Amino acid sequence: MELTRRDLVKFGGGACLVASSAALAAPVAAMAEEAAAGHVVRSAEVAFSQEADILIIGTGIAGLAAGMEPALAGKKVIFAEKKGSFGGDSASSCWFMFASGSKPQLDAGLTTTIDQAWEAVAEKQTAGFDQYEWYPEWAKGKYYANTKFVDCAIENFGCQIQEPATADELPRLSASVILPAEGIGTGYTYILSPIQAKLEELGCEFEYEMRAVALIKDAPEGAVIGCRFEDAEGAYVDIKAGAVVLATGGFVDNGEMVTKYLPEWANMGVLVHGSMGEGHRMAAAAGAQVANMDSSFTYCNLMGDIPNATTWGYWAPLVLVLPNGKRFIQEGQSHDAAAAAIEAGYREWWVIFDQQAFDARCIAKSVENNINVHADAYRTADTIADLAVAMDVPADVLTATFEEYDGYVAAGEDAAFGKTSWLKSLSAPFHALKLNAVRYKTSGGLMVGPNNQVLDNDGQEIEGLYACGAVTTLSYASCSTVAATGYFVGETLATK
């Protein structure tokens, strides 16, 4: 539908762009009055060329989840994605998800219901935001949305998950973990792709290579009614919507923002490309409060550049060593390996494993895929001494490390690092993957209110502007909570 400038008046007056550092644009009226003073390069009047009930910016799991219930309800939904395909950062996720009381968990004999799970965690989940009287109910809604997302994804969108892990397979976390059908790292195939395909089947439109540059309001202090994009040819595209959802991810690939908010990470490499903080900046320009931008130090972590391998220690015995051949961490805690390696003076480490990792159904596909994809970082040998040579670490030190580790196994106690789960010896042939410490995700950003609309600097909701996923403070950049915040937004919009 082509909308003219005259049509805009019918929708509540002249629309205006909200300028951000990503795109400088002046309100049309001001441009007309001050044309003699100059002209902003590449500024243009608002000219809506498309319209939808809901415009979702970003197609990671948060964005896709935000579209599920609206699509089922028959809403017209447009997804806009700056990359050439869907998935966002979620495409490279480990897909280590959590839920309680979902249908597959109950069917597997796990007896905890969502109501029981909430009762156990309600006090913790609702703490910290006493200034908002609505927060406890919102926190409950987000928590329940996590389980609802799992059930809806399976029942209505054709997603496939593994049978829940047993306590023997996952000693620390078994009852609450949800994994895609072939385990860790297979979420693109079994979660993202089915959801995206079903959304298209339900009539949702996907616009790729569309970079969001500025939100559009119906007045400078009014409601958000759309967004301006730049397409692959550099032309502006303005899309109008009754609700605009920011699902734009974090800011881990924005060196300027990382330097400002997370200076300790500024000189680290980055694994996930494209998380530039555009949503943060566009929302701030529209009057949104941006908070807790340094919370990555609490809720996120540096990661290995083969992120799946960072989780294998939950499922199988591993030995992690530094380039000096020494252990440096309790391997079941390997999400913290990057930080521990840096503290020890290194930015790299080796994950050493054996056939037990190939046989563990929850990580087997991930192990096989990663040694094939990362052949340059993969080594194997029949003895520890030969493995040390292949890894270019001191053979005498690595041999001593394994002798010490095997002693702890025999004693039934890891006196060095306190490892309990998977305190087992490795046997030949031995395998190793080299990991480098990188930035992987960030936390902090927008706060949403009781109706899932973004809060302004006065704590009031900005009409028409919604947010979910890593652009929000309360998703903590976790795969599960990112999906939950998206689904929760979708529940809100499906009934509007």
PLM feature spans:
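Glycine-rich FAD pyrophosphate-binding loop
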Residues: 73-90
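An anion/pyrophosphate-binding glycine-rich loop and adjacent beta-alpha core
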Residues: 280-282, 289-393
